[in-house]
């Protein structure tokens, strides 16, 4: 089968045409891939950064955001049928630890990821345990379903706390941050402010309903950044701090600024992964009585049900997809992702 694989311990990704079709077991399904989306994690692997060097076995078929069709299944599978349109939860868990047995599979200590630790979805076929497979409603397109993984991250982050009527600060306007703007607006947030240094994506955020999309690139230090943010808050009629902070960037200055402008009793969801150490103002957390929640992946499968229901109720995520390419144009897709001048990039695996 055709696949994209990390074949060498250096920047890049390579297409192969002779990868074996994976074998499926008693409780597995074999999925024919229709669409995949390129994730920031895939870009890290492509660039072969320090995290990738320490994490990714080589050779490895990568990718974990997908939509496809069930073409075969093990004898023990009763939850899906051949012909079903599906996506799937890319975190594989042990099923035996305390959290798994308590129904908190997203907190499994032994989580491994498809396309990171085991064969991924950048291939014509993928094998996945049936328990990880999620059927796609007819009203949802393959393109949108291929983004369920990052959309689930956005849903988990945004809906960890009530957003209705609240003032929300989002730091980081990558594709997941942009999804969060859509979610917060759909859920009735009062004011939504988002920060980034990428003007292309900030304009997308404005189009998606952000009250203010602030380019923080011009500000030379933390004091200038906080001063400008307080001016923004005043300009839009805020007399107190933000009620909810959604941190998507992993950038030290963004986190510090967020802590500075949160209201007393504010709540923060933290999804962004830092490339290095983060200095934290514990005084702000303590004296403001802030609540912090770390986010890793999606709640299985409550997050999936929530995002499906919201899409069916009219939340429009189609504008997040800015580029659609055939798999043979994968190199162009990765270059577009590297440029940052995009939302989600979808790869079509049809012949």
Swiss-Prot record:
Gene3D superfamilies: Medium-chain alcohol dehydrogenases, catalytic domain (3.90.180.10), NAD(P)-binding Rossmann-like Domain (3.40.50.720). Transmembrane segments: none annotated. NAD(+) binds at residues 176, 196, 201, 271-273, 295-296. The keyword Transmembrane helix does not apply. Keywords: Cytoplasm, Metal-binding, NAD, Oxidoreductase, Zinc. One of its GO terms (biological process) is L-threonine catabolic process to glycine. GO terms for cellular component: cytoplasm. It is found in: Cytoplasm. Its cofactor is Zn(2+). GO terms for molecular function: L-threonine 3-dehydrogenase activity; zinc ion binding. The keyword rRNA-binding does not apply. Pathway: Amino-acid degradation; L-threonine degradation via oxydo-reductase pathway; glycine from L-threonine: step 1/2. Zn(2+) 2 binds at residues 94, 97, 100, 108. It catalyses: L-threonine + NAD(+) = (2S)-2-amino-3-oxobutanoate + NADH + H(+). InterPro entries: ADH-like_C, ADH-like_N, ADH_Zn_CS, GroES-like_sf, L-Threonine_3-DHase, NAD(P)-bd_dom_sf, Zn_alcohol_dh. Zn(2+) 1 binds at residues 39, 64-65. The active site is at residues 41, 44. Homotetramer. Belongs to the zinc-containing alcohol dehydrogenase family. NCBIfam families: PRK05396.1 (NF003808), tdh (TIGR00692). This is L-threonine 3-dehydrogenase.
